[in-house]
């Protein structure tokens, strides 16, 4: 089960979290019971819909009879308007530009918060709640979708971003990759980039969007694990 509770985020209350814990406890017990390498291998459990705040505030790690062999996983797709939102809504605009030096003057698509300091604060929460207590943390997914001038609003022929400044958008994606990678590592969390063929050619192993990969590598070099 990936991102448990994801289909009903607005209603992930105590009963739902209890169900997630029961499911994960069953998983752990079943794996350990098979013996062999499974008796001691590292296992990964996910916090409620892999959300940092839910995992920090509402989640308790399941029990494992084997000490120091459980890891916790979260995902990072914040802010949603920058990483996943694909067209403007009545409640808000798509963020095409992210980071203090990447805003476009006069644009309605600049990020309004949830930038560098927010990323640091979120990973600090995971460090305090888990990594500092000896519980390994992985960021099992993180990425921000690519937008182009040719993108259309889903189900229509209308252009979604006709006025996009592609250079600044690319810089924003690269910088987001850099900041998230760096801050995850600095706060003791191991990041795994979610790549489905948009940034890499899986057939040749070459970069399709070199700037995005360069952002990851820059963040990886700058981020030093604290342990």
Where are these regions (language model features)?
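Aromatic-rich peripheral "rim/lid" segments of glycoside hydrolase catalytic domains that contact
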Residues: 64, 149-227
């Amino acid at each position: 089960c990936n991102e448990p509770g994801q289909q009903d985020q607005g209603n992930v209350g105590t009963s739902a979290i209890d169900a997630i814990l029961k499911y994960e406890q069953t998983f752990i017990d079943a794996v350990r019971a098979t013996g062999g390498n499974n008796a001691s291998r590292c296992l990964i459990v996910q916090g409620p819909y892999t959300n940092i705040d839910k995992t920090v505030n509402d989640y308790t790690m399941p029990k494992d009879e084997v000490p120091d062999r459980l890891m916790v996983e979260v995902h990072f797709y914040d802010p949603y308007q920058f990483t996943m939102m694909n067209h403007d809504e009545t409640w808000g605009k798509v963020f095409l530009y992210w980071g203090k030096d990447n805003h476009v003057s006069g644009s309605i698509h600049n990020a309004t918060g949830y930038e560098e300091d927010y990323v640091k604060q979120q990973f600090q929460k995971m460090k305090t709640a888990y990594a500092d207590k000896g519980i390994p943390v992985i960021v099992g997914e993180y990425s921000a979708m690519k937008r182009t001038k040719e993108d259309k609003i889903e189900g229509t022929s209308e252009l979604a971003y006709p006025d996009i400044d592609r250079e600044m958008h690319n810089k924003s994606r690269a910088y987001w990759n850099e900041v998230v990678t760096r801050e995850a590592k600095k706060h003791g969390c191991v990041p795994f980039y979610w790549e489905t063929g948009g940034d890499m050619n899986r057939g040749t192993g070459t970069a399709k969007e070199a700037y995005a990969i360069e952002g990851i590598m820059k963040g990886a070099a700058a981020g030093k694990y604290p342990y």
